[in-house]
Amino acid sequence: MNNKVVEKFYEKYAWIIFLGIGIMVLAGAIPHMLGFNTDPALVETIGGQTIDELKLSSPMFFNLYNFYFSSGGLSDLGFGFFLIVISLFAYRQGQKWSWYSFWFIPAFFLAFMVLSSTLPSESQSILYPPLIVLIILSLAGLLLPFRKFFPKKH
């Protein structure tokens, strides 16, 4: 008698969704952490000045901006790292705690959307599409392997 459970393809490989999200977050975090703004148009839309104009007009405020910008990148680096490690090991193996903890991911991106709703509409149109994609992907990554984490009771 063979008691081996055969996983469906989408259950077995859903962890790759979170691995991909983690890699994207990590890739964006590195220049962010080093102080390289990869979207200067967003800064200009929100602040009304280019980064260079901000640096010239208010060096102290620019230092504050740069500190928070770089430390946000450091936070993203940690977020991406843990996302990658958990998806590669615990989530891939079907450990329930990882499924529960990964509900933070769509909640995080949804909270980012809510926070972004206070920005000018031009900024929202830049931020919303990738956030919506990340929310949908993370929900798919949670719901596709549901039976892997919570098998039917016979």
Residue ranges, per PLM feature:
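Membrane-water interface at the C-terminal end of transmembrane alpha helices
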Residues: 136-154
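Membrane-helix boundary connector in multi-pass membrane proteins
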Residues: 111-131
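Juxtamembrane helix-loop boundaries in multi-pass membrane proteins
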Residues: 65-69, 96-105, 130
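Hydrophobic transmembrane helix segments
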Residues: 21-69, 75
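Short, Lys/Arg-rich, polar N-terminal cytosolic tail immediately upstream
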Residues: 1-8
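Interfacial segments of alpha-helical transmembrane regions
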Residues: 9-23, 98-102
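Helical transmembrane-bundle signal
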Residues: 18-32, 76-79, 83-86, 106-116, ...
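Juxtamembrane helix-break-helix junctions at the cytosolic face
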Residues: 80-100
